[in-house]
Amino acid sequence: MPDVELTWLGHASFRVDTPGGKRLYVDPWLSNPKCPDGEKEPERVDVIALTHGHGDHVGETVDLGKQFSPKLVAIIELASWLEGQGYPNGGELGFNKGGTIEVEGIRFSMTHAIHSSAMYGDGPPIYLGEPAGYVIEFENGTKIYFAGDTAAFTDMQIIGKYLEPDVAVLPIGDHYTMGPRQAAVALELLGTKRCVPCHYGTFDLLTGTPEELRRHASGVEVLAPEPGETITV
């Protein structure tokens, strides 16, 4: 069976082409300043997974939902809210931390994250459930941990022991999430030896770099694709 093909679309957005031929988008903010022009208008979307409700992660989810009707993987409050915004059957698969669901042959286990989750507009912020991460098990058995926006937390040890991810996708930009030094601690807690950094380089505030992560995370293979570049895992 083919490998998992992971394409970084800038910030915390990823396109994943699965061994079973499905196309998954994680946190599709395709209008982010680092997303290549050729990736801004997808030709196909089978599944969307959202880690939390901030605009730089929800991105174009509602528009993609209306265009392609993909299955939506999200915590129940966020999923229900997105259905109210026009996402067809958006709340159908809403679930919560500790739960595992199978969607299009892909298994999603929702994990804890330390962050916030709300949508901001003219009025008070709209609470959209707790932030989350996922360990995603693909059709060939490969497991990738998408941590979402988070700080390191000691229960990452449980994620590593119980869900056993092969690769960890971790934010490293600092300011809004953990930076490289704390991400190295997260990798030690997880016991994962391969890491794809994200949530860096989008704005001047996000100062963390893959080079700094490599300095702190000795013994870990840091895979740092350019925006639009595809790697196999």
Identify the function of each model-found stretch:
Residues M1-R23, W29-K34, R107, T111, ...:
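Zn-dependent metallo-beta-lactamase
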Residues M119-L189:
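Active-site-proximal loop/helix segments of hydrolase catalytic cores
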Residues G59-I101, I106-M119:
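Glycine/small-residue-rich loop that forms an oxyanion/phosphate-binding "nest" at active or ligand-binding sites
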Residues N32-P33, H54-G59, A79-L82, G99-E102, ...:
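Active-site environment of divalent metal-dependent phosphoester hydrolases
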Residues R15-H54, G59-K66, A74-S80, S116-Y127, ...:
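Pre-active-site segment of Zn-dependent metallo-hydrolases
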Residues V16-G20, V103-E104, I136-N140:
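Active-site beta-strand termini and strand-to-loop segments that position acidic
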Residues K22-L24, D46-A49, I106, T142-I144, ...:
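Structural motif
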Residues K71, E83-I101, Q182-V233:
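Binuclear metal-ion centers of metallo-dependent hydrolases, dominated by the metallo-beta-lactamase
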